[in-house]
Amino acid sequence: MIYQMQMPAKIEVDEATHTDRFGRFVAQPLERGYGVTLGNVMRRALLASLPGTAITGLKIDGVFHEFSTINGVREDVPEIVLNLKKVRFRSNCKRNCKTSLVLNGQKEFTAGDIIAQEGEFEVLNKDLHIATVNEGATLKIDIFVGRGRGYLPSEENRPDGMPIGFIAIDAIFTPIRNVKFTVENTRVGQRTDYEKMILDVETDGSITPDDSISLAGKIINEHVTFFADFSPTEEEFTEEEFKQQDDEFENMRKLFNTKIEDLDLSVRSHNCLRLAEIDTIGDLVSRKEDELLNYKNFGKKSLTELKEQLEKFDLKFGMDITKYQMKG
């Protein structure tokens, strides 16, 4: 029997300070010590685990290293790099992309000039100053945009196959601008040693504070579930049962590794899945229905078609196939 611990009835929201970018959330009452425990784990998950979009590198015509100056441009390359790090995006696209710009002076280069060639992303802080191109000068620049989690330093951000003159930059993927928590005492009945945890979350606008704490909570839950489901005793199986389990396991693994192109799908559905980088049945069933509907050109007709295909294999969306994935 597990001792019943005091738990919050719900998360309270401070409506007076709540905006699309800032939220103050209160969890109470908590057992003593759990305010700091939950505050720390939520803060770490929010800062390091939420996916986001950022500029990962650039290439400027006529520039071969990051400490150069550019003829006809007021700012040098280090200044431009610092400004590009501040550009914030909203994007559901999971693949990396590149956009090319040609800017002729007299011209102020702002973040709003960075436009996705295929609508992969949207710049949020369009007025952010990047550089000034002087009259008669031209700035040709390729900007590489990618998806990731947390923060990736430039030293680890140099993919193979990049052109000569590619300059990797520190990628700040996290959509969280700031997060902090405080812990105060609170009363339950006659006891005053319970705790109240107050969590302040500020985002860059690509995600709401409500969605950010919900996603962080789900990520944490997925990790602690491993401990909750742990059992120190193992069931005894006969050799024949072990063999049957192994055969079923291998059959499922092969099924999840089956290429999407082997399914009888329409050209439209194939193209949507390819753009979303969904290559196998395993990739497909790992997605949830609402996640698929967020992809470009993916509608309910395509969703119905995919459902019918999965039902043939007794599969569905939102499956956890972690144990079937190859390790190492």
Curated annotation (Swiss-Prot):
Gene source species: Chlorobium limicola (strain DSM 245 / NBRC 103803 / 6330)
Record carries keyword Hydrolase: no
Keywords, alphabetical: DNA-directed RNA polymerase, Nucleotidyltransferase, Transcription, Transferase
Classification via NCBIfam families: PRK05182.1-2, PRK05182.2-5, rpoA
GO (cellular component) term, any one: DNA-directed RNA polymerase complex
Gene Ontology terms: biological process: DNA-templated transcription
Stretch list, region Alpha N-terminal domain (alpha-NTD): 1-231
EC number: 2.7.7.6
InterPro entries in the cross-refs: DNA-dir_RNA_pol_insert, DNA-dir_RNA_pol_RpoA/D/Rpb3, DNA-dir_RpoA, RBP11-like, RNAP_asu_C, RNApol_insert_sf
CDD domains per UniProt: RNAP_alpha_NTD (cd06928)
Annotated function: DNA-dependent RNA polymerase catalyzes the transcription of DNA into RNA using the four ribonucleoside triphosphates as substrates.
GO molecular function, one term: DNA-directed RNA polymerase activity
Homology family: Belongs to the RNA polymerase alpha chain family.
Classification via HAMAP family: RNApol_bact_RpoA
Domain notes: The N-terminal domain is essential for RNAP assembly and basal transcription, whereas the C-terminal domain is involved in interaction with transcriptional regulators and with upstream promoter elements.
Enzyme kind, highest EC tier: transferase
Assembly with partners or alone: Homodimer. The RNAP catalytic core consists of 2 alpha, 1 beta, 1 beta' and 1 omega subunit. When a sigma factor is associated with the core the holoenzyme is formed, which can initiate transcription.
Pfam families: RNA_pol_A_bac, RNA_pol_A_CTD, RNA_pol_L
Name of the protein: DNA-directed RNA polymerase subunit alpha
Keyword Repeat: no
SUPFAM superfamilies registered for this protein in UniProt: C-terminal domain of RNA polymerase alpha subunit, Insert subdomain of RNA polymerase alpha subunit, RBP11-like subunits of RNA polymerase
Catalytically driven reaction(s): RNA(n) + a ribonucleoside 5'-triphosphate = RNA(n+1) + diphosphate
Alpha C-terminal domain (alpha-CTD) as annotated region, ranges: 252-328
